[in-house]
Amino acid sequence: MNRPAPSLSLRLFHRLDVWIQRKRIELLRRRFAGCGRDVSIQWPVVINGADHLQVGDRVSINAFVHIWAQGGVRIGDDSLIASHVAITSLTHSLTGGKYSESCLHLPIEIGRNVWVGTHAVILPGVKIGDNAVV
């Protein structure tokens, strides 16, 4: 079955989309504590504390991911963060059952070749080993 060639406007739209993606990565790369090669970030995402986020090589972060990295977040090489994932390295301190407005910052480590599935929540202080599926 022969398909017609994509229209010029569709090809231009695709090229523009690819260019915008590259520019977003370049801008984020400057803000991250570290960013590897061949990183893919689909939009929209929310990243707070980007200067405490380290992303390895060939990492993919999908749309609607929220990352609160103020306590430090490290994502290892070849890892995939599926859509709608929440990663938070800060929480409120609970002392004797009493709520405190002060925040507790605990680093998160996501190993190499990790797949974090859709709607997962990674909480402060969590360490996920290499080759894991969450």
Predicted segments — roles?
Residues 45-55, 60-127:
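Flexible, glycine/small-residue-enriched loop-and-beta-strand segment within the central core
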Residues 134:
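Binuclear metal-ion centers of metallo-dependent hydrolases, dominated by the metallo-beta-lactamase
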Residues 1-38, 78, 92-94, 113, ...:
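Terminal amphipathic alpha-helical/low-complexity segments used for targeting or macromolecular assembly
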